[in-house]
């Protein structure tokens, strides 16, 4: 299965009539492996800050997390494994695997829990596959 298929079928899937606004699978250095059409372009320093937060949980909390210059308030995640952010009525979930970052960005009517479920389920599967 191609990386694009994972994005199209597993991240941009229909959940109770809703879907993520955008999603992607990136390498740890920020290289895009696959992405949905509307996925924003991360800046290198944004990826570096996200990776630092995985290594040093809490690093982003005081300043917030920036994604394509949009600022997200960092909310409870799983230290070293999942970073979650909130911005207005939407948010972001980033799951780290051995080689990749699985990213989902949502807005209402999708809920944070639905976004978390979709992103973390694929991330857990990739971890099980050694990726």
From Swiss-Prot:
It comes from the Eukaryota. Phosphorylated by MAP kinases. Its main location: cytoplasm. The keyword Transmembrane does not apply. InterPro entries: PFN, PFN_euk, PFN_sf, Profilin_CS. Disulfide bonds join 13-115. It is found in: Cytoplasm, Cytoskeleton. Pfam families: Profilin. GO terms for molecular function: actin monomer binding. The modification Phosphothreonine is found at residue 111. A motif (Involved in PIP2 interaction) lies at residues 81-97. One of its GO terms (cellular component) is cytoskeleton. The keyword Disulfide bond applies. Keywords: Actin-binding, Allergen, Cytoplasm, Cytoskeleton, Disulfide bond, Phosphoprotein. Gene3D superfamilies: Dynein light chain 2a, cytoplasmic. The variability of the residues taking part of IgE-binding epitopes might be responsible of the difference in cross-reactivity among olive pollen cultivars, and between distantly related pollen species, leading to a variable range of allergy reactions among atopic patients. Binds to actin and affects the structure of the cytoskeleton. At high concentrations, profilin prevents the polymerization of actin, whereas it enhances it at low concentrations. Occurs in many kinds of cells as a complex with monomeric actin in a 1:1 ratio. Belongs to the profilin family. This is Profilin-3.
């Amino acid at each position: 299965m191609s990386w694009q298929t994972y994005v199209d079928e597993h991240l941009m899937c229909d959940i109770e009539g809703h879907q993520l606004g955008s999603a992607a699978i990136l390498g740890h250095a920020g290289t895009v492996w696959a992405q949905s059409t509307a996925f924003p372009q991360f800046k290198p320093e944004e990826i570096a800050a996200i990776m630092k937060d995985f290594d040093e949980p809490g690093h982003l909390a005081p300043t917030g997390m920036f994604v394509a210059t949009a600022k997200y308030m960092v909310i409870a995640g799983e230290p070293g494994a999942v970073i979650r952010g909130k911005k207005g009525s939407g948010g972001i979930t980033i799951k780290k695997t051995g080689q990749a970052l699985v990213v989902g960005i949502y807005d209402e009517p999708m809920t944070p829990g639905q976004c978390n479920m979709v992103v973390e389920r694929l991330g857990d599967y990739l971890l099980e596959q050694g990726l």
